[in-house]
Amino acid sequence: MRPLAAWGRFVYRRRWLVLLVSLLAVGASIASLLAGGDLRDVEFRDTESGRASQLLRDELPRPSGAPAVATSSFVLIFASNEALDASDPRFIAAMNAALDPLRADSRVVSVVTPDAVPPQQAAGLRSKDGKRALASVTVQGGTNAAGQFFAALRALVRSDSVDVLATGNVPLNHDIDTALEADLQRAELVSLPVAFLLLLIVFGSAAASLVTLGVGVVVILGGIGGTFALARSTDVSQYALNIVTLIGLGVAIDYSLFIVSRFREELAHGANVEDAIAIALATAGRAIVFSGITVAIGLAGMLFYPGTFLVSLGLSGSIVVAISVLYALTFLPALLAILGPRVGAWRLPFTGRPSRRRLWHGIATQVMRRPVPVLLATVAFIALAASPFLGLRLASADATVLPPALESRRGYDVLVGEFPGQDQSGVTVVARFPDDPLSTAHRAAVEDLRTRIAALPNVSRADISPTSGPHVAVLTVRTPRTAQSDDARDLVRAIRQQPVAGGEVLVTGGTAFDVDGIQYLLERTPVAIGFVMLTTVLALFLLLGSVVLPLKAILMNVLSVSASFGALVWIIQQGHLANVLNFTPQSI
């Protein structure tokens, strides 16, 4: 590719200028990173449950005295460390004393405790054995906004007489965000040293390893900065940073390996620095450009899921891949032009080039001598690794994604296991009419709908909410099944089959979002996969000038992706290594 060779010579002659511009770009990325952005949990909007949820927000009146701003809530579970009953006056006094600082905080809208509500409602706020009680706390701001100050509120609740656990939407979401950030930092702290050691083995030179790793670092900075810049103009998922870090480091090191290795080979063959850079970019650089295109194509498949968090993941991934290609063709060759032969400095004495060549040459020779047995054995192993993929079960994330030792997870387990009704799940049914839902005819239709829903399997009760909107009536349905169980999903589907005279039935709630999200993904996945395969074949055909090789590449990708998903199912869903890795087996 002659343009890349010419570009390599330009970079060599203007290496300090190219390096300066690259560093300015890194500085801009750092500035964008420091400016931050609002990363959030992006919902599925274009689904029945999403439309029903929006309809409720638009139509239902705000309760009297409720704030005009959005609110969210969490619960505090109290247990006496002196074995007092939750109805004991000393227990109640200690609980209220611990809650007084919350009541005085301007960010807290309300605090509901068992002693402040009617006896029938209070029973639901005490555990089955009567030893624990919970307080429901409503705060200003949505779940994401409240998560910013939740830690400060939690620190206000202290007591020497009662033990306290916080759980609910706000602390669970806060802990998920915190866990993601901690995992991101841990991944960086672990992956960078491991990558450096592997590069030392590959290059046998500390200088070449540091150059390659340095490109990975600046690519990650650029990717995170680009993601935060994207977040200032559109919704970006909180998981985007994980994608940027993992893909950015891997791709940047991969591309740098290509160029640095080819550059050193040309120097070893007697080329001067300028020619070595030109040849490296014309060969390895060409492969990098097409590799970046194919990786971006794969990530672009996520754009076929509009209205979901996957779009932002695809955009963030594409940004970091583009930055990887950009720095591999600018920042890296500028460094190589400055270092020249010194890129091989600080050589390790125990990593000689001949032995490494003999190792890989020997492996390749053995494979070529017995291609059919090696192929059959490899495919058989991959098929075995992929076999658990056939039992894949999809579900939305819930509290079980958190480590069991976290307070919000422990509180969730106590809440579900010890408080009446908390082990059940709810379904919200919206009956929408063209006019007043309180008219005589519509009242009768809603009551008929309630009766039919109450008779469905796995329904413990179905009630008509006293609150209605200009065009909607609301029913609340309780089921003894957990939100992500097959029975709860079947119930959502069964309710959606129930008609209401003169109107339309919409179902929302956690289980409905789960059902709709999975269905949404399954409907669009074939189109996304078809797009990725077709465009990848086209890109590889233009690169290789072959029809067979692109098809082989697609087949290898299918096998490797299937094996990867098989490993995920085997570990995460089936629970192998759960004790070692400290997680709860769950759907993916």
Language model: regions and residue ranges:
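Structured non-transmembrane domains adjacent to transmembrane bundles in polytopic membrane proteins
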Residues: 45-71, 80-173, 391-580
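Membrane-embedded transmembrane helical bundles of large multi-pass transporters/channels
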Residues: 1-37, 108, 123, 128, ...
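Disorder-to-helix initiation segments
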Residues: 41-42, 49, 246
